[in-house]
A protein has these predicted regions:
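Membrane-embedded helix-loop-helix hairpins and adjacent transmembrane boundary segments
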Residues: 1-513
Length: 513
């Protein structure tokens, strides 16, 4: 117990210390929201990765999908690395950075408003982000509480409040730069922690070969492959179709999430994007691949906890796997998941507060608000969002994965297509953007009431629908003015200026002497 407490105290002290150290970088709106657009590739890549993977992934998704799909759930981690990180950086990174700087936009709704020359689109995007980021923030705590309850036997409410207060302190002090530096530290902890945990769990089950053999002898209880042995160690698992839905939601979804795309706004230059792409992809392979690989052995643990609906409590799977580890490893796990959760929470509340302040309050209500007042309002809203997320977390309405599925589906379904097409194609119309918003949010919300499929599949469908609807509607609706389009895209015509030192000929140098 002493080891675990010491690790936590040191961790908390470092987080607060970083907030104090970086407070000088948060003296204006640009510094507070984007770190002055001067954040290096390492900090940006780690900020992207740690915002991507939280306790939702480690406890919620890894436990649930590892139990359902066995080792084939590792495909989710591979998809996260290839589609959610590598392709996201290659396709969106440079163009998002260049166009957002050209349009002087600090948030995704502001980008939409300026790219499509529509204040109504900006306000609608801000409202969608405001409404659907909340379920994600509340879900971050839930996974953490399971591990804290296992390690320290302390009440859930204490876990939630302590984490919220600590996150709020360093975000309010240092803004984006505090989150970026802390994300880097937390990312290092996550990399070390996930490797140590996998080794510890496999050793506790007789090593990889023995664990694999035991898993291969289990009969599938999934309808598609019911009764078959070896389904949980097969290439695509017992239920490939639903597995594909999870891969699409968790991988392609990052392309449309405001808190993820914002990382491209803040990176300092185009050269840094190349370095960041490599780092971010490696980070995702280790963290996501490791989490889902670990979850693939979930059936080796006897989980008896049942929900009120009579189904297995998937949120208890990973904590049960870890409960027999030595104290030092449990301490590492707690700090690992705390790191993942705090980094995601800090990114979410900073994104939410900046969108509400810059796009709704300053953009529509108090247009003459000065920078000092904007900073004050953002800090107040950070407190508001954290308190709201705590209230929701203390009475969670559904499973971690379902909460995440609702928010990811609505946000990515609404924003992915208007963003991706808007960066490359001059033909996107305002009507096409509105159609994307309606399709993304409409499918997700309709499924909440109709329950015709799982929130995971509904989220994946909403993203694909947006990618289809936006171009179709754009083909048959009035185009933007040529001047409006040319203004947005002329940023790509600019060539980076490279300073070249020219050496004087030797005879001129001699003559000068």
């Amino acid at each position: 117990m002493v080891i675990k407490v010491v690790l936590l105290i040191v961790f908390f002290a470092i987080m607060i210390g970083v907030g104090v150290y970086t407070r000088k970088a948060a003296t204006d709106v640009n510094g507070f929201v984007l770190g002055g657009r001067s954040v290096g590739p390492w900090l940006t890549a780690f900020a992207y990765g740690t915002s991507y993977f939280s306790a939702v992934v480690f406890v919620g998704y890894a436990g649930q999908f590892g139990y359902k799909y066995g080792l084939s759930d590792t495909w989710i981690g591979i998809g996260n690395a290839v589609i959610g990180s590598l392709l996201a950086w290659l396709v969106l990174g440079r163009r998002t950075r260049v166009m957002s700087k050209h349009l002087n936009s600090a948030t995704m709704p502001d980008f939409f408003g300026k790219r499509y020359h529509s204040n109504a689109i900006r306000i609608a995007a801000a409202l969608i982000a405001f409404i659907f980021l909340i379920p994600y923030t509340s879900s971050v705590y839930n996974g953490l509480s399971r591990l804290f309850g296992m390690a320290f036997d302390i009440p859930y409410s204490v876990c939630v409040i302590a984490m919220a207060v600590l996150t709020g302190v360093y975000v309010i002090l240092g803004g984006y730069m505090a989150t970026a530096v802390n994300d880097f530290i937390q990312g290092i902890i996550m990399l070390i922690g996930i490797v140590a945990v996998i080794v510890g769990v496999l050793n506790g089950n007789g090593g990889f070969i023995e664990a694999y053999k035991t898993l291969s002898q289990m009969e599938s209880d999934v309808a598609v492959t019911e009764g078959l042995q070896g389904a949980f160690v097969s290439f695509f698992g017992p239920d490939p179709v639903n597995l594909l839905g999870v891969v699409i939601l968790t991988s392609l979804g990052t392309w449309g999430l405001p808190q993820m795309v914002q990382k491209f706004y803040a990176i300092k230059d185009e050269r840094s994007i190349k370095t960041g792409t490599i780092i971010s992809t490696f980070f995702a392979f280790v963290i996501a691949g490791g989490c889902y690989f670990l979850g693939g052995f979930a059936r080796l643990v006897d989980v008896t906890e049942i929900t009120v609906n009579g189904s297995l409590a998937y949120d208890a799977v990973i904590p049960s796997m870890l409960s027999k580890l030595p104290d030092i490893l449990i301490g590492v796990v707690v700090v690992l998941v705390l790191s993942a959760s705090m980094s995601t929470l800090s990114s979410l509340v900073l994104t939410s507060s900046s969108i509400l302040t810059l796009d709704l309050i300053k953009g529509s209500i108090s247009k003459n608000m000065n920078e000092k007042k904007q900073l004050f309002v953002m800090r107040v809203l950070i407190v508001f969002f954290i308190v709201l997320s705590v209230v929701l977390a203390l009475d969670p309405p559904t499973f971690i994965a379902q909460l995440m599925g609702i928010s990811w589906g609505a946000l990515a379904g609404a924003f992915l297509a208007p963003l991706a097409y808007g960066l490359y194609w001059k033909g996107v119309t305002r009507a096409g953007v509105w159609a994307g918003f309606v399709a993304g949010v409409g499918i997700t919300v309709a499924n909440i009431f109709a329950k015709w499929t799982s929130p995971i599949n509904a989220g994946a469908i909403s993203m694909i629908a947006g990618l289809v609807v936006v171009p179709l509607v754009s083909f048959i609706t009035p185009k933007l003015e040529k001047g409006e389009i040319d203004f947005s895209f002329k940023c790509y015509d600019k060539k980076p200026v490279i300073e070249k030192k020219i050496a004087l000929p030797e005879d001129l140098v001699a003559e000068e002497k």
